[in-house]
């Protein structure tokens, strides 16, 4: 039957080459789907079902076990079950304390609507400032958590803090499951998923910050990004049926939008993803229709996010929107020419140039007409980071000194090498990248790709999902080599790509094709290696790292900070309810969470006004006069000043990166570069001088509380000068 129907199909192709391709592929899918029950033996169907069932069970189990591991480790580290509420809250440091404090505020609100209104018109957090906390701090996770806590009746079963961290740990389990599924989809075996999870957990110092800062936005957002990438991987596969394609598209749409709502920097990651898809389409490796369907998801998510994020201008001026709009315009201007011809190659180059030019032009136009203040400090930081500008600005230099914003250290590469992750990742990346280049050159020369690539072909670079991941991981890795904090986005996909490679017979077959192996049957050897290599890696990881993981769970650690507990207790008992506190932003976040009192600054770095406040408040550790400090504090209506001994007497490993050094540089009290003049301040360091209790400091400030770590001063409203 198939042979008799062959010639008419070819005639139809000649008459209607465009429409018939889709029809023929659809027919082939239907034909391949229908006969399976008739031709495939029952034991083959059972094997397929068992493989899928075991893989799904392993993926879900891996996610659940990881979530339980995080919960147990957190309990051992902070001993939550034996702590009072105040001691538990102190474990939330910096910006994490701010996020959790708003979760508490939502639970205390008389109704959900009232709670949302108070957050969107918040004037009880920062003095002299009304902020839309939901928009500015992306508090949608806290809104959702508070709804779930009250709607499910969990307030009668579990404490709010356990419910909150339980949701985050559950999301981390979903994160691991999504990575498992992605590696499984790419390699065809769930063994790759198991190896991905093993590498992820072993290298968790470099894969996640969940152990140190639970409420961080990335801990809420990245699990959805992992789900989006898993769906995109399935969507790009060429052998996916119609129902699978629809499911992947719907999952990708939902996860993309959720990811964008959870994290203010999500559109930058999606921008890198869009670049990867653009390059995939440029080299004609994937059907343009599929790629442009993904672009539609970006546009839908951006505009829906813009509306639901209180008309957030950052989304309108984002490079993602400019790039997608440029790609859509370029598609409208594209000409239909014969693929592989010289004219087609020229048009490809012109199209690439057109997209780049339109992206930059549209972004400039949007920034001209859309008022925005978002991420201006980020551009300044990048200029200083890459040496395009020099500055003595305290905030910029302080950011440069942060470990997460510096280049990766040697210890980072050593850890990845010891776990065998880095060597196998480099091997897999090189093979996939070279195979991808072969495909690109083949397309440039006008050669068409095979509709179905078999194992014997040894062409792993012809698979669109593989090429996408290669491009994406190269982009992420390049950025992570400059800013170490981006490793938490890159390394999880390093685990996934390395595990896929060593478990993929196609990758080994591609390597054997290049080596022209003839002594042993290459297909048989590829199948053996795809099972043996991950098994050997897994056994070695089990032997070396499993005892360490068990030891961590057995050790009972203790987070002990009595000085901070005493400070918070004193504030709650002695300070007036309307008091405003000034101090380091990190401490102010803890005060906001533990006491609810108003503060002058917050540990947030996405607002220019807050950054300026932080710099001004930090002047209490500089060589400024008592009068200058008094004027700064009273300008923010502060009533109490808290001096931290750890900052005032800081002995940092890097001279020039201590807070007091950065302040001296900004104020011109220290040599910064050759040629700079050293100016001497006639005043001592304020944080030292104010402790001595002599005039004029006692005229402006009265010490009301102190312990080993903190000194609290009341800012006098009536100044009495003493001789």
Swiss-Prot record:
Tissue: Widely expressed.
Sequence segments annotated as region (Disordered): 1-33
Subcellular location: Membrane
Membrane topology type: Multi-pass membrane protein
Gene Ontology molecular-function annotations: mannosyltransferase activity
Transmembrane segments: 52-72, 161-178, 184-202, 222-240, 260-280, 292-310, 316-337, 349-370, 421-441, 466-486, 489-509, 522-542
Compositional bias segments (type: Basic and acidic residues): 18-32
Key words, A-Z: Acetylation, Glycosyltransferase, Membrane, Transferase, Transmembrane, Transmembrane helix
Main location: membrane
Domain of life assignment: Eukaryota
Enzyme class: transferase
Residue list for modification N-acetylalanine: 2
EC numbers: 2.4.1.-
Disulfide bonds: none
GO cellular component terms attached to this protein's record: endoplasmic reticulum membrane
A Pfam family recorded for this sequence: Dpy19
Ranges in a coiled coil: none
Family statement: Belongs to the dpy-19 family.
Protein's job: Probable C-mannosyltransferase that mediates C-mannosylation of tryptophan residues on target proteins.
Name assigned to this protein: Probable C-mannosyltransferase DPY19L4
Organism expressing this protein natively: Homo sapiens
